[in-house]
UniProtKB/Swiss-Prot annotation:
Its main location: membrane. Disruption phenotype: Impairs the synthesis of austinol and dehydroaustinol and accumulates the intermediate compound protoaustinoid A. This is FAD-binding monooxygenase ausB. The lineage of its organism: Eukaryota, Fungi, Dikarya, Ascomycota, Pezizomycotina. One of its GO terms (biological process) is terpenoid biosynthetic process. GO terms for cellular component: membrane. Pathway: Secondary metabolite biosynthesis; terpenoid biosynthesis. The record marks 517 as: Transition state stabilizer. In A.calidoustus, the austinoid gene cluster lies on a contiguous DNA region, while clusters from E.nidulans and P.brasilianum are split in their respective genomes. Genetic rearrangements provoked variability among the clusters and E.nidulans produces the least number of austionoid derivatives with the end products austinol and dehydroaustinol, while P.brasilianum can produce until acetoxydehydroaustin, and A.calidoustus produces the highest number of identified derivatives. Belongs to the FAD-binding monooxygenase family.
Length: 745
């Protein structure tokens, strides 16, 4: 099998390919970029001739010499300073092995055989590679090219204040990858630990703060975790959420408010993607190779450019890019033949639907037939909104979502003052931990249920996240007994709400409450009583594909004008580098992905040996809960302590510090985490679901799978261990060195 790699520096618009290969920076090498190269530019909707290039023996060679590529036209506008997007670009991360597979356009078996059995395996067709290696911001279909662009107007970027960061010699002390709630929490906790704003640099491919709440702006968007515990730093900012579950716009503006309060706007580098992090042992620093995507005042018409390669260094690096950053696009046959409109919920097209994120009145859908593919948490929120405006709505469901009732309400200022603020200092953390206790069956009988919502009424979810009772031999019987009333109540609610019996039965989720992340909504099931809304239950294979007129399920065609892909995000690998799509090379030149191939070894789930001064909040060997903001906050607090104490020991000279786990330290922690794997035994009773072993932790090697699992005793146990470790002051399990001009000590 061959290895194929996407080349990030691709053709400029209208460039005569016959005149030479793609332009590369003078210092470009595959090792620095994190990719090897295979470039294939193919026909665009059958209209444009194409050329292939390959690099062989350090020289570019043209494989087939044809004509020039015309300027690329997007949505009727000439796109300037935007890389040409090949029809089926090859985009394969470093070290990923690509095997032949059926092409989405239906390449014949004979053709595939010729392509894969050629004398030079390095020139495999992009048609084959494209299906195996689906990129994040580059798609195998020209129809879905909008996933490669930021559709939102600039509101938070000072485009003039970042020019100094473009110099290759730029150095920052602490690099934070991600500017969502996770990245902001790390920045704030580091500032509170005594570091200055000038010590920090936040880098994000988005055009502003917010992370998943920056990219997602679809109608009906809200967080289904109570906003009083999910929205970080409420106590410090003094912000009162407008509702128990606030809409997405408020979450995004809250992220911007956090950045403003701690004056982080000038310490953020947006529309920038880090491709490679490489440890420089001699310089005791990370070398970051990045690509600036440019600043666009109107993403659909191009912009003022400003993109290009960027290299800088950092003493410490924190990967805080989160898990919901890679839109999942189904490999649908016939996408490019569909004559209607299509987009993903992560890049909502209000130009087509009408409305805006602040006022999603989709008046342009009146008279339109809309098809929604997917029934996960995103679809549950967006389907009722689409039903309000469309002429006809067809929902295509493979497996039903587990949807509980969400009782949202406006926040009463009097209640807020008399109940929330009255709890005193630390109220948000206490409320969060109360929530954690109830969803992990760790609450004492006398404990008041402060959040009191669908989550805290579904304690069987403990089987997916760990808890104090999970280690008991009879836990599976216990959790099934706890879950049975919830399951029966959910079935009764659907049957009493949905008038059509066939539709009602199709909407019933029979899985245990811990097998798939639950959803919560007001009015989802009622939507299916509307005369213009239909539910199509597919088989396990899902939708067959698209035709020029609509969506195919088997041989049946459902004609639609718009296809909405509510297919969620690709959770992908549990390796932090893979999840962030960064090639991370450690002190021995070993890629993090390679080290994690046999299962991770970590200290506290936030560091791994061989990758000095690198931190990564995640789920492997760490405590988890449904409230990801709490997880980020606890990790940020812990990492800030480690860096702060090490800096104090070094006399304040942060650039001299080199920190990594000892071999014994990470072995001990990993052993302790693996010893608690029985806490997740109940997940073996599940089928396919985003929290099951079969889906997220599947491995032919049981030990590898066990190393990827969270801390089995739950979040409270994990936090208690970390607090005791910090209180001891010994920094046990860490190898801390202080570099000087004479070496390290």
């Amino acid at each position: 099998m061959a290895k194929l790699y996407y080349m990030p520096y691709i053709f400029n618009e209208g460039m005569p390919l016959a005149s030479g290969p793609p332009t590369l920076p003078e210092d470009f090498t595959p090792e620095k970029s994190g990719f090897r190269v295979l470039v294939e530019v193919r026909r665009m909707k059958g209209h444009f001739p194409a050329q292939k290039w390959r690099k062989r023996n350090q020289e570019w060679q043209c494989i087939n010499n044809e004509t020039l590529l015309p300027d690329h036209v997007r949505n009727g506008h000439l796109a300037k300073n935007v890389p040409y997007r090949p029809y089926r670009p090859v985009y394969v991360p470093f070290a990923m092995t690509v095997s032949p597979t059926t092409d989405a356009m239906g390449t014949s078996e004979e053709t595939r055989s010729k392509q894969t059995k050629g004398s030079n395996d390095d020139i495999l067709s992009a048609k084959i590679a494209g299906r195996v290696a689906r990129p994040v911001y580059h798609c195998t279909s020209a129809r879905l090219h909008d996933l490669a662009y930021d559709p939102w107007p600039i509101t938070t970027i000072d485009t003039h204040g970042l020019s100094s960061l473009k110099a290759p010699s730029t150095h920052t002390r602490i690099l934070i990858i991600g500017a969502g709630f996770g990245g902001l929490l790390f920045a704030v906790r580091l500032l509170q630990a005594g570091f200055s704003r000038d010590d920090l640099l936040l880098v994000d491919s988005a055009g502003g703060f917010g992370g998943t709440w920056y990219w997602n702006r679809y109608p009906g968007l809200m967080c289904d975790i109570e906003s009083y515990i999910y929205m970080p730093l409420l106590e410090e900012t003094g912000h009162m959420p407008s509702r128990k579950y606030v809409p997405g716009e408020e979450l995004r503006t809250h992220a911007e408010g956090i950045a403003a309060k701690w004056e982080l706007e000038q310490r953020a580098l947006f529309r920038t993607t880090i491709r490679t992090l490489e440890w420089d042992e001699g310089g005791n620093q990370w070398i970051a190779h990045a690509e600036q995507l440019g600043v666009f005042t109107d993403a659909k018409q191009g912009g003022n450019g400003g993109g290009g390669p960027l290299t800088f260094t950092a003493t410490f690096a924190i990967i805080a890019s989160g898990t919901l950053s890679k839109p999942k696009v189904p490999n649908l046959h016939g996408v490019d033949d569909f004559q209607g409109h299509i987009f993903h919920t992560a890049r909502w097209d209000y130009d087509y639907t009408g409305g805006s994120p602040a006022n999603p009145a989709m008046h342009r859908l009146q008279g339109k037939r809309v098809g929604v593919i997917g029934t996960g948490s995103t679809a549950v929120q967006v389907i009722p909104q689409l039903a309000r405006w469309s002429k006809e709505l067809i929902v295509f469901q493979r497996t039903p979502a587990a949807v509980g009732l969400q009782k949202n309400q406006v926040t009463d200022p009097v209640w807020w003052k008399g109940n929330i603020l009255k709890a005193g200092s630390g109220w948000q953390r206490k409320r969060s931990e109360n929530f954690n206790a109830f969803i992990s069956i760790s609450n004492p009988p006398c404990m008041e249920n402060l959040v009191n919502d669908g989550w805290t009424s579904s304690p069987s979810f403990s089987a997916a996240i760990g808890g104090a009772l999970n280690m008991q031999p009879d836990f599976l019987d216990l959790v099934k007994a706890i879950d049975r009333p919830r399951l029966e109540a959910a079935q009764d609610h659907i049957r009493s709400t949905v008038r059509d019996d066939t539709t009602a039965e199709a909407l019933i989720n029979l899985n245990h409450g811990w097998c798939k992340r639950p959803c919560f909504h007001q009015g989802y099931f009622e939507t299916y009583n509307l005369p213009h809304v239909r539910l199509i239950k597919t088989d396990a294979a899902g939708v067959t594909g698209l035709s020029p007129k609509g969506i195919l399920v088997g041989d049946t065609l459902y004609e639609v004008d718009l296809v909405v892909l509510a297919t969620g995000y690709d959770l992908g690998s549990l390796c932090p580098a893979d999840r962030a799509q960064i090639q991370v090379l450690g002190s021995e030149g070993v890629a993090m992905k390679e080290k994690w191939a046999g299962g991770p070894t970590t200290l506290h789930g936030v560091m791994t040996r061989g990758f000095p001064n690198l931190f990564f909040p995640g789920t492997s060997q760490a405590g988890v809960t449904a409230n990801q903001s709490y997880m980020f906050d606890r990790a940020a607090e812990h990492v800030a302590y480690i860096i702060q104490n090490s800096t104090l020991e070094a006399g304040g000279y942060i650039d001299k510090i080199r920190i990594e786990p000892t071999a014994e330290g990470e072995k001990h922690w990993t052993t302790q985490s693996v010893a608690r794997i029985s806490a997740f035994a109940a997940t073996t009773a599940c089928g396919t679901g985003d929290y099951t072993i079969s889906n997220r932790y599947r491995s032919s090697d049981v030990d590898t799978m066990a190393r990827h699992m969270p801390w089995g005793e739950g979040m409270a146990s994990y936090v208690k261990i970390l607090e005791a470790w910090r209180e001891s002051g010994t920094m046990e399990g860490l190898d801390i060195r202080y570099h000087s001009s004479e070496g390290s000590r």
